[in-house]
């Protein structure tokens, strides 16, 4: 999708470039479906019909009913809506269990709930970035109102067995709400919603624009769910505010586009990931933070020599774009790597490369060549 062959974009876990066909859908929707879907005249009825079609299309990719799918502005809003709503909905206890390497949009709401008297237990990941599901389950009891766990980690790409976690949580306490942040998983790995109550996805990770996301809310929970927002009956009262119909249609188009190519994309991503792993093996200073069984779209490593911001700036001078951590934690050390037990040097020198289907072997080679130059010439950290 990039017109400049000299530009190598390898930060797709932060955001993806909007697909041209998705942009076309949005542009057409802005011109043809301008009416408010909630109004009562003819053009509004057509807008409502288009909104319902978009909702059904996104729901199909998740394997849920259309009425269980609610449009939001992004994955972060979906997480906030689910978590704060869960606390308002379940009043039989104050206990919450969460993994120790969640996105800030999960961390911060739970930190706020802790200040308001909730007992939030944080379970650290193993040193390889995987989560001990059994340890999570040890903390689930009769007063546990919520368990939250991301499906794919946004920094190191590790995948958590949220299906097993959800099933075991429900065996221990059927009233416990299970929330999953699937922002980095959606359209990359299969998602099974059995025993999951709420699940967040985002558009700008799948070549839709920024400003659109969705929340799955199970039929099991919808009648009791108490959303934290007030002010309108849009999205069946869950999320007030006039719906962003063009972007909802764009989200549906982006999801449908990727649904056709999940297997072939996985093969291509694995080849790119392995090419990068093989190239990095030439540098004895490099330690991989992403385990071999992480999703192939993400490879995180520490070069243990040069500050991340120095290396990133050097790469950017050659129009090679990667990151050092989550874009939502800009300027902050990686809490994921810290939770994995990495030392300060490894955290300060970490780099995340993340792929999409538009990336090529040439992108990987350009990165490796420039990275080699940086390792030779940039100022090293004094140990």
Question: Language-model segments: which ranges?
Answer:
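Pyridoxal 5′-phosphate
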Residues: 1-383
